[in-house]
């Protein structure tokens, strides 16, 4: 299965060796060598980097580690192709505009019957590639699009969270459906199941989180603001597997989080 990574923080920071740590899960005999992507939010827009080469051999990965933009919200992805050819159209994270903001989505799992599922309707959004992940993103966006909102504004947090949870519940019935979804304001996280490397079984946990309160910076993040801002920094990292020896917390199957600027602001348990 694919590898997921996300960072949410109060003040702009750089992922530094988080990129290398994520790429380490795509080297050697790993199956995850079918492409990678990184998204760095800059306000309502996003700087998106994707490639179809293995992350551990692509020269762009260490370049981004040293020169990538500082941000308060970032998503990362390494692909193991279960559906669709190895090409850019099938490589996440996927990005679309909605409500005047770039929306970004990355998924870990295999939704085998998604395209044939009658309740699934992606509406006016259509995937560019052939993956289940891109189709899942389109149907989520179509549901978000229908929520009440003022022109150019986001729907309420509760409405968005409820919709993310409803879509996650529908996807889980079709297969493992862990995903990261960001709308420039909030990072939504759904933890499901994944194939465990030691047992080969598809079980939880599929995601881990690392919470670093004010004044404690994680090893994989470098603060890019003043020393005063660094003392008030607050960071949450999400990853498919623990990337350091720090106190990563396994997420429960069916757990949905809404995270803003390094703080969990809402939760749902499916």
For each of these PLM feature ranges, what is it?
Residues 2, 103-113:
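Conserved beta-strand-loop-short alpha-helix elements that form
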């Amino acid at each position: 299965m694919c590898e997921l990574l996300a960072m949410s923080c109060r003040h702009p920071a750089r992922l530094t060796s988080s990129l290398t740590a994520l790429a380490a899960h795509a080297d050697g005999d790993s199956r995850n060598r079918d492409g990678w992507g990184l998204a760095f939010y800059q306000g309502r827009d996003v700087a998106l980097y994707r490639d179809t080469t293995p992350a551990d051999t692509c020269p762009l990965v260490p370049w981004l580690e040293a020169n990538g933009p500082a941000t308060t919200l970032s998503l990362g992805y390494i692909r193991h192709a279960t559906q669709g050819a190895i090409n850019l159209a099938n490589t996440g994270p996927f990005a679309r505009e909605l409500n005047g903001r770039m929306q970004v989505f990355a998924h870990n799992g295999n939704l085998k019957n998604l395209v044939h599922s009658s309740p699934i309707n992606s509406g006016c959004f259509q995937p560019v590639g052939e993956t289940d992940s891109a189709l899942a993103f389109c149907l989520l966006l179509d549901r978000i699009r229908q929520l009440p909102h003022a022109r150019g504004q986001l729907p309420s947090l509760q409405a968005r969270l409820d919709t993310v949870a409803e879509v996650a519940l529908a996807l889980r019935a079709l297969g493992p459906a862990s995903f990261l979804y960001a709308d420039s304001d909030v990072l939504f996280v759904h933890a499901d199941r994944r194939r465990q490397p030691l047992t080969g079984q598809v079980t939880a946990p599929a995601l881990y989180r690392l919470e670093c309160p004010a004044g404690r910076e994680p090893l994989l993040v470098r603060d890019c603001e003043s020393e005063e801002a660094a003392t008030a920094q607050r960071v949450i990292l999400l990853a498919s597997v623990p990337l350091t020896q720090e106190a990563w917390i396994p997420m429960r199957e069916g757990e949905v989080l809404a995270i803003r600027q390094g703080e969990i602001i809402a939760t749902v348990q499916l």
